[in-house]
Regions:
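Non-catalytic ligand/cofactor/substrate-binding and regulatory segments of enzyme domains
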Residues: 2, 7-12, 18-37, 143-159
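...with weaker cross-activation on analogous glycine-rich loops/strands in unrelated enzymes
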Residues: 21-28, 71-138, 142-143, 158-159
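Generic structural signal for secondary-structure transition and capping sites
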Residues: 36-39, 96
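Surface-exposed patches in mature extracellular/periplasmic domains of secreted proteins
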Residues: 39-43, 67-72
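Residues in well-ordered beta-strands of folded domains
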Residues: 40, 129, 155
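Active-site nucleophilic cysteine motif
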Residues: 44-63
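N-terminal non-globular leader segments, chiefly Sec-dependent signal peptides
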Residues: 47, 65-66, 70, 88, ...
Length: 159
């Protein structure tokens, strides 16, 4: 992401913590540029349409955290009919599971249906940015009824 942004931790880049802090900020800044993007199953175009999985892939790629990720077709209701943890195992390829509390830019995966099937970017727990099927990309609170009480796992993609 090259938008003229200057990392506030630039003076700490020679430390692992400083470089990681800048990456976390870059992820959240990129995620904010997706706000208002309509929901579209398997879409991955900012401003035109995305779902929660594709938004994560595009945001972390644009911020330089992961390479381009090709995702094979999945039906919109895959999580209702399968026990296979496709999303969870895919996340584990690119991020390390952490016990929490999550930090800025970490990923929260929520259980929907029979498996972990909804991802969001943590802003400041429980504040999130995610793509919601009825509303598109928006800020949310994990304490809202749609997410509250659901099993959730956290991942650090900055490893």
């Amino acid at each position: 992401m090259d938008d003229g942004y200057e990392c506030p931790f630039e003076h700490l880049h020679d430390t692992e913590a400083g470089a990681k802090a800048c990456k976390r900020v870059a992820v959240t800044r990129e995620a904010e540029t997706w706000l208002g993007t309509p929901y579209h199953h398997m879409g991955r175009v900012k401003g035109a349409g995305t779902d929660c999985l594709m938004m994560l892939a595009e945001v972390y790629e644009a911020a330089g955290i992961v390479p381009h990720i090709e995702v094979s077709f999945y039906p919109p209701d895959w999580h209702l009919h399968h026990d296979a943890e496709r999303y969870l195992y895919g996340m584990m390829r690119y991020a390390r599971e952490i016990p929490g509390p999550p930090e800025l830019g970490d990923v929260a995966l929520f259980k929907f249906g029979r498996c972990f099937a909804h991802g969001a970017i943590v802003i400041e727990w429980p504040s999130l940015i995610h793509a919601w099927h009825s509303a598109g990309v928006l800020y949310a609170d994990a304490k809202q009824p749609q997410l509250a009480g659901r099993p959730v796992r956290f991942f650090d993609p900055f490893v």
